[in-house]
Swiss-Prot record:
Species annotation: Homo sapiens
Catalytic activity: chloride(in) = chloride(out)
Name the record gives this protein: Gamma-aminobutyric acid receptor subunit alpha-5
Residues covered by region (Disordered): 377-412
Gene encoding the protein: GABRA5
Disulfide bonds: C173-C187
PROSITE patterns: NEUROTR_ION_CHANNEL (PS00236)
Length: 462
């Protein structure tokens, strides 16, 4: 009985162990099957896409554009600006860093597969047809290749391609500097097909005229300009090989005036004010007034030369040139004013000397007459007893002597008054020069600061 119970217990135990082992084996078998299936599925997808790409490129001729002989190839473009600047005034060019995107449709690259869009390696770009886009006003362009070529290529199942590359472009920026430094400019970026005319390839903006060119919020790298906005458009040119479409994007710039106020305008204004200080100096202070005049003229000459160093050698006068020229005229006029005052001062001294000489002659004549009358009076009185004290002087002698002294004192006082007097020209200059210079500044700044810049060939930014 005991043996039967023991054998039954062993059978139950073995049955339980068998069930547990079956469950464990089934569990591990269930968890391993999906992993194997995923790997197989992934390998299958890679194999499928490899076969698709090999099939697409089999017999593909990248020398021929899509739709050759059937339709015009349309290339849609847009630009994302990551960095704008710097701008060189002397070279009239600017530098821009962009993501340049192009999209077109190539029916030869249609495919059917588990994915609608294939992100491809940039190496495939050399095996398919791509637009021959070039920049008309570009002086130098760099395609970034670190750490790999900065290019992106995507293919959709209907044959639509998206081709993006990162470029740094140095382009021409024609500038009209008549209003410098209160000027504004529209720097263009022009691109299009090099070989295909409008009858074969046309360019259009992807997102219309408002969102096809976007500048990053922190993309401005400008020290002397404000980036006011950008506008896009198209141009058509006709050559001997056909008509071509040129895509244009204008970047609107407004110059910052602060640097030039500190470096040029304030020094010029202070130099003019310093030249007018000489009007308040004594007109006989020839060395001091000469130093004021010559120093201010030389200072204005130095300022005018240094102001031109930051500009290209244009053949017309800028707004700053006009301001410097007027300041130079005020400084030079102050020097001429001193020369005029000095001339009339010396002439006045000569006139005073002539008067003094005539007065001296009259004085000598009076002294001769006085001596004769004194001698006659002394001779006539010798018969009378000398009861008059030595200190007492005859009335006639006393009166004559007093008359002869007074003219000398008056001439001396007049001479001193002429020497220390203020010139009428200086009095007028103290009022006229500051008023005229203040009026000029008022008109100058009101005219240029309120002027709306007109840029030919570019619409104003919205």
């Amino acid at each position: 009985m005991d043996n039967g119970m023991f054998s039954g217990f062993i059978m139950i135990k073995n049955l339980l162990l068998f069930c547990i082992s079956m469950n464990l084996s089934s569990h591990f078998g269930f968890s391993q099957m999906p992993t194997s299936s995923v790997k197989d599925e992934t390998n299958d997808n890679i194999t499928i896409f490899t076969r698709i790409l090999d099939g697409l490129l089999d017999g593909y001729d990248n020398r021929l554009r899509p739709g050759l002989g059937e339709r015009i190839t349309q290339v849609r473009t847009d630009i994302y600006v990551t960095s704008f600047g710097p701008v060189s005034d002397t070279e009239m060019e600017y530098t821009i860093d962009v993501f340049f995107r192009q999209s077109w449709k190539d029916e030869r690259l249609r495919f059917k597969g588990p994915m609608q869009r294939l992100p491809l390696n940039n190496l495939l770009a050399s095996k398919i047809w791509t637009p021959d886009t070039f920049f008309h006003n570009g002086k130098k362009s760099i395609a970034h290749n670190m750490t790999t070529p900065n290019k992106l290529l995507r293919l959709e199942d209907d044959g639509t391609l998206l081709y993006t590359m990162r470029l740094t472009i140095s382009a021409e920026c024609p500038m009209q500097l008549e209003d410098f430094p209160m000027d504004a400019h529209a720097c263009p970026l022009k691109f299009g097909s090099y070989a295909y005319p409008n009858s074969e390839v046309v360019y259009v903006w992807t997102n219309g005229s408002t969102k096809s060119v976007v500048v990053a919020e922190d993309g401005s790298r400008l020290n002397q300009y404000h980036l006011m906005g950008q506008t896009v458009g198209t141009e058509n040119i006709s050559t001997s090989t056909g008509e071509y479409t040129i895509m244009t994007a204008h970047f609107h710039l407004k110059r910052k005036i602060g640097y030039f106020v500190i470096q040029t305008y304030l020094p010029c204004i202070m130099t003019v004010i310093l030249s007018q200080v000489s009007f308040w100096l004594n007109r006989e202070s020839v060395p001091a007034r000469t130093v004021f005049g010559v120093t201010t003229v030389l200072t204005m000459t130095t300022l005018s030369i240094s102001a031109r160093n930051s500009l290209p050698k244009v053949a017309y006068a800028t707004a700053m040139d006009w301001f410097i020229a007027v300041c130079y005229a005020f400084v030079f006029s102050a020097l001429i004013e001193f020369a005029t005052v000095n001339y009339f001062t010396k002439r006045g001294w000569a006139w005073d000397g002539k008067k003094a000489l005539e007065a001296a002659k009259i004085k000598k004549k009076r002294e001769v007459i006085l001596n004769k009358s004194t001698n006659a009076f002394t001779t006539g009185k010798m018969s009378h007893p000398p009861n008059i004290p030595k200190e007492q002087t005859p009335a006639g002698t006393s009166n004559t002597t007093s008359v002869s002294v007074k003219p000398s004192e008056e001439k001396t006082s007049e001479s001193k008054k002429t020497y220390n007097s203020i010139s009428k020209i200086d009095k007028m200059s103290r009022i006229v020069f500051p008023v005229l210079f203040g009026t000029f500044n008022l008109v100058y700044w009101a005219t240029y600061l309120n002027r709306e810049p007109v840029i030919k060939g570019a619409a104003s930014p919205k």
